[in-house]
UniProtKB/Swiss-Prot annotation:
One of its GO terms (cellular component) is cytosol. InterPro entries: YbaB-like_sf, YbaB/EbfC. Residues 1-25, 87-111 are annotated as: Disordered. This is Nucleoid-associated protein PP_4268. It comes from the Bacteria. Transmembrane segments: none annotated. One of its GO terms (molecular function) is DNA binding. Homodimer.
């Protein structure tokens, strides 16, 4: 590889690292909302997987043991939905970073 080619690759790597750091900060501060039960339960989560808020529709509030189990299932489903959305958002944004870069075949990024 020519000396200029190596310098170009190093410059690209440095630029990518800077972009990755900025993107990771943006992703960490982004919020997604996971839902279940047709919106009866919703969870707001950050890109760091921190739960900011859980909302439960009043119609689900009951002292009946069966209703309690349904509510627990809906909360778990809403949390899982939020986690999937965080992961999907992260993959989409980070995957777009390598577009247009001339990376060697088979080169994999650390994310």
């Amino acid at each position: 590889m020519m000396k200029g080619g190596m310098a170009g690759l190093m410059k690209q790597a440095q630029q990518m690292q800077e972009k990755m750091q900025k993107m990771q900060e943006e992703l960490a501060n982004a919020e997604v909302t996971g839902q279940s039960g047709g919106g009866l339960v919703s969870v707001v989560m950050t890109g760091r997987h921190d739960v900011k808020r859980v909302s439960i529709d009043q119609s689900l509030m009951s002292t009946d043991e069966d209703d309690k189990e349904v509510l627990e299932d809906l909360i778990a489903a809403a949390l899982n939905d939020a986690v999937r959305k965080v992961e999907q958002s992260s993959q989409e944004k980070m995957g777009g970073m390598t577009a247009g870069m001339q990376l060697p075949p088979g080169f994999k990024m650390p994310f």
